[in-house]
Amino acid sequence: MKILDRLIGSLRGCCHSLPDIRQGGDVRYTMADIGLSAFSLFFMQSPSFLAHQRRLDEGQGRSNCQTLFGLDRIPSDNHIRALLDPVNPDHFHPVFAEVVAELEGSGGLKGFRQPGGHVLIALDGTEYHVSKKVHCQRCSTRQRGKDTTEHFHAMLSATIVAPGHNRVVPLEPEFIVPQDGHEKQDCESRAVRRWLERHGRRHTRLKPV
């Protein structure tokens, strides 16, 4: 639990420093509350914000949210989205680095080491939103038939993996979004190049292959 407490503390500090678009001093939830509330949804493995809220209202998992995250109340999903959507995901990159550092220091990466001390880093594109109606400026698009446009969000996920290992270690993702100064749509291969340029050198100490 000490490692988990330190990592949650790191996440709390990261969320506390997130840019806040709200004006005025009457704030019911801090940005740390907002960020940790979103994270608790995934940590508690709830299928949706609504299901998460209902579970807490019914007392299920409330003690865990209070003990682990210090959350007495969970903001509504709309409130969380309104404050987190404008935040650049890069703000969370230090937390990924902290996870890797903790695992290195505690020997948690030993099970991922391959012959020669190498680790396997898998880069793979994935979509996490697809809609024919709901879209935004950061959406990519594709045609489905003559008259149908499909909008989607995609990202390049980076993970430390190992054969026969049922867990992975997530690294900083790279989002596949329209790039300033580029007329062509962004794609997975360009995201791979950006990820290597931004993060490759820092991860060389892991001896990746």
Residues of each region from the PLM?
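Generic alpha-helix structural propensity
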Residues: A32-L36, M44-P47, A51, P75-A82, ...
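Short, conserved catalytic/metal-binding motifs centered on acidic residues
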Residues: S37, H52, S76, I80, ...
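Active-site-proximal, Lys/Arg-enriched surface segment
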Residues: R81-H165
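Charged/polar, low-hydrophobicity segments characteristic of intrinsically disordered regions
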Residues: C65-A82, E188-R194
